Swiss-Prot record:
PTM statement from Swiss-Prot or TrEMBL: Phosphorylated.
Species classification: Eukaryota, Viridiplantae, Streptophyta, Embryophyta, Tracheophyta
DELLA motif, short sequence motif: residues: 42-46
VHIID, as annotated region: 279-344
Main location: nucleus
Annotated organism of origin: Brassica campestris (Field mustard)
Listed name of the protein: DELLA protein RGA1
GO biological process, one term: negative regulation of gibberellic acid mediated signaling pathway
Subcellular location: Nucleus
UniProt-reported outcome of changing Q328R: In brrga1-1; causes a dwarf phenotype due to its inability to be degraded
Bias-annotated ranges (Polar residues): 9-25
Coiled coil residues, start to end: none
Region (Leucine repeat I (LRI)): 206-260
Family: Belongs to the GRAS family. DELLA subfamily.
Length: 573
């Protein structure tokens, strides 16, 4: 809103306080700041792929006003060719795109002169205060529709149009109507189809990826001003996408924003409890956790062959979803089931309840029903690095065979100095017949933020793409939230707070080898049965099981996503 003139006048009401010389230092400094701001805006527009300068935005806004007015007043016949014959592929070149659109429309009422349709705009063409940043839209149109491989931006010609007033308070912009009605609003009464301006979806997708990468690069170089501007544009560009791309971009945008504004996600007991619940939904939606449990159980079952007393120490107890299948397999074992002891380790509950005990009670009921001798004990630990072998009530290996199991847990130790070495030391004291490990197949633990960001963007884009084939349900939505929390931790956090430090099989193999473990190859039965399991999900389409040096990898198309490996103490130990 304009201030009254007397607010800027001195006591004599005739001399301006700040207006005696245009070459004063204050004015010069203001001009310099404006030039720097324009350069920053030009940089941002260039990064996003728009071939236009900030100084040209006023004229672009003028053309957008003309285009909106023409489309609002054109008849159905005058726009039909846009919906059928004309496709505009590159709105990044705003000048040529707008000129092309204005030429294609060519309304019958148009006269010579670029602003003949709206003479009020001509009268105020040099008044840049008429145009503000809020008047501009990166992509024109009021609605977004998905059509094959393109995005269709629809303009509803049957809706009411309100044209902006000029800078003069007494002049109103009007549009001619068949009834000759003059006023601030014009209502189109003709019924028409929605004419479409089609934009290549790949163009928008590429621009979105470029914006994500540019923002991550700005964060790494500590250019937070540019990063802040880019993260806002990422959210805007993401809504023009559909499916997995929109969801992934939204989660990465949130994570980048948290890093920029130093709003680290919480790492509390409530957060642990929520992650546990979300993991259950993830288990129901897609085959990744089922594959992890099945392949690990198969390796444990083979290692327990012929043993009368067996003991599993689970580093990732959670809701105990892995163990009913193993207990049923033991119950069906030739010669009768062995005595089965289970030690479950998990984080503390938010309400201080003994949730591990509740899980044990449910498993005990199952064991009784299938006639398996069962013993259970749960341990609460904030970190696996807090464990000590003496807590586990180990029995002589001659009387009891022990297996250690870890699913998506070991990578959380890599941010704690000496954490993984401490756990490996405890496992060697346990002397298990097998140590089964499931981890994400990706390197998200490098020292360079931009490299981690790039790898995680590829990895989670593939994961979200695999979820698109699942039926829409609450489980699917919660599964996406589960993955989104991982993205947030990976991108927004550093130091001990960043626990999502995934590494590849080759990296883990080096760690295990240097710590005194040797690989225990998974059998062919696990490979065949895992392939059968995947057929239950989307007909198995897209999922692949691959064998890699005795380990099993679950891939979506050609990208490995998780790996199951098994280890035993090397001969020298």
């Amino acid at each position: 809103m304009k201030r009254d003139l007397h607010q800027f006048q001195g006591p004599n009401h005739g001399t301006s306080i700040a207006g005696s010389s245009t070459s004063s230092p204050a004015v010069f400094g203001k001009d310099k700041m404006m030039m720097v701001k324009e350069e920053e805006d030009d940089e941002l527009l260039g990064v996003l792929g728009y071939k236009v300068r900030s100084s040209e935005m006023a004229e672009v806004a003028l053309k957008l006003e003309q285009l909106e007015t023409m489309m609002g007043n054109a008849q159905e016949d005058g726009l039909a060719h846009l919906a059928t014959d004309t496709v505009h592929y590159n709105p990044a070149e705003l000048y040529s795109w707008l000129d092309n659109m204005l030429t294609e429309l060519n309304p019958p009422a148009a006269t010579t002169g670029s602003n003949a349709l709206n003479p009020e705009i001509n009268n105020n063409n040099n008044n840049n205060s008429f145009f503000t940043g809020g008047d501009l839209k990166a992509i024109p149109g009021n609605a977004v529709c998905r059509r094959s491989n393109q995005f269709a931006f629809a303009v509803d010609s049957s809706s009411n149009k309100r044209l902006k007033p000029s800078s003069s308070p007494d002049s109103m912009v009007t549009s001619p109507s068949p009834a000759g009605v003059i006023g601030t609003t014009v209502t189109t009464v003709t019924e028409s189809t929605r004419p479409l301006i089609l934009v290549d979806s790949q163009d928008n997708g590429v621009r979105l990826v470029h914006a994500l990468m540019a923002c991550a690069e700005a964060v790494q170089s500590s250019n937070l001003t540019l990063a802040e501007a880019l993260v806002k544009q990422i959210g805007f560009l993401a809504v023009s996408q559909a499916g997995a791309m929109r969801k992934v971009a939204t989660y990465f945008a949130e994570a980048l924003a948290r890093r920029i504004y130093r709003l680290s996600p919480p790492q509390t007991q409530i957060d642990h409890s929520l992650s546990d619940t979300l993991q259950m939904h993830f288990y129901e939606t897609c085959p990744y956790l089922k594959f992890a449990h099945f392949t690990a159980n198969q390796a444990i079952l083979e290692a327990f062959e012929g043993k009368k007393r067996v003991h599993v120490i689970d580093f990732s107890m959670n809701q105990g979803l892995q163990w009913p299948a193993l207990m049923q397999a033991l119950a069906l074992r030739e010669g009768g089931p062995p005595s089965f002891r289970l030690t479950g380790i998990g984080p503390p509950a938010a309400d201080n309840s003994d949730h591990l005990h509740e899980v044990g009670c449910k498993l005990a009921q199952l064991a009784e029903a299938i006639h398996v001798e069962f013993e259970y004990r749960g341990f609460v630990a904030n970190s696996l690095a807090d464990l000590d072998a003496s807590m586990l009530e180990l029995r002589p290996s001659e009387t009891e065979a022990v297996a250690v199991n870890s699913v998506f847990e070991l990578h959380k130790l890599l941010g704690r100095t000496g954490g993984i070495e401490k756990v490996f030391g405890v496992v060697k004291q346990i002397k298990p017949v097998i140590f089964t490990v499931v981890e994400q197949e990706s390197n998200h633990n490098g020292p360079v933020f931009l490299d981690r960001f790039t790898e995680s963007l590829h990895y989670y884009s593939t994961l979200f793409d695999s979820l698109e084939g699942a039926p829409s349900s609450q489980d699917k939505v919660m599964s996406e939230v589960y993955l989104g929390k991982q993205i947030c931790n990976l991108v927004a956090c550093e130091g001990p707070d960043r626990v999502e430090r995934h590494e590849t099989l080759s990296q883990w193999s080096n760690r295990f080898g240097s710590s005194g473990f040797a690989p225990a190859h998974l059998g062919s039965n696990a490979f065949k049965q895992a392939s059968t399991l995947l057929a239950l999900f989307n007909g198995g389409e897209g999922y692949r099981v691959e064998e890699n040096n005795g380990c099993l990898m679950l891939s979506w198309h050609t990208r490995p996503l998780i790996t199951t490996s098994a280890w035993k103490l090397s001969a020298v130990h």
